[in-house]
């Protein structure tokens, strides 16, 4: 099970997540969001993620929302990102055609309203990973796991990362309910008073990796 810790705002939290075995670390590159970080912090986190001690090969994900391809690629290179996450209403066919195919993309789809779009796109875009999340993301809004499980049983070819309302107490339940999920994504569920809680980060990764 892949584990992504998103919305990181400090180098300390990033180092903790790397040391605890996270597969992906997400930084918010959308202007004006509560977890958006400035370039110096982003570069510090990037350095921490790409250090030699990162034996697991944790990847750094930049989260974007309805930004131009030029802006996305500029920050991709500036922050030495490994993965681009598109969390808005982007035309994934267009973005995939303009972003080098070697760069992995995570695309947010809302459930259930984006399911038909997802099915239409599935065979037409390469190196794109599906993320089921709420509209805004990072809100703690829990998705309907039962409904996703039922839909997924009819479309087992669609593997996905699940986000929305996950925390150390419920992540194992979500994983058990969603056999076609290949990853879990957490942000607010490992925070205390809006700040990443390092003990919660560690516990979440442990629970998701069992």
UniProtKB/Swiss-Prot annotation:
Pfam families: PRAI (PF00697). One of its GO terms (molecular function) is phosphoribosylanthranilate isomerase activity. SUPFAM superfamilies: Ribulose-phoshate binding barrel (SSF51366). Pathway: Amino-acid biosynthesis; L-tryptophan biosynthesis; L-tryptophan from chorismate: step 3/5. It is an enzyme of class 5 (isomerase). It catalyses: N-(5-phospho-beta-D-ribosyl)anthranilate = 1-(2-carboxyphenylamino)-1-deoxy-D-ribulose 5-phosphate. GO terms for biological process: L-tryptophan biosynthetic process. The keyword Amino-acid biosynthesis applies. Keywords: Amino-acid biosynthesis, Aromatic amino acid biosynthesis, Isomerase, Tryptophan biosynthesis. Gene3D superfamilies: Aldolase class I. Its EC number is 5.3.1.24. The keyword Isomerase applies. Belongs to the TrpF family. PANTHER family: N-(5'-PHOSPHORIBOSYL)ANTHRANILATE ISOMERASE. HAMAP family: PRAI. This is N-(5'-phosphoribosyl)anthranilate isomerase. It comes from Kluyveromyces lactis (strain ATCC 8585 / CBS 2359 / DSM 70799 / NBRC 1267 / NRRL Y-1140 / WM37) (Yeast). The lineage of its organism: Eukaryota, Fungi, Dikarya, Ascomycota, Saccharomycotina.
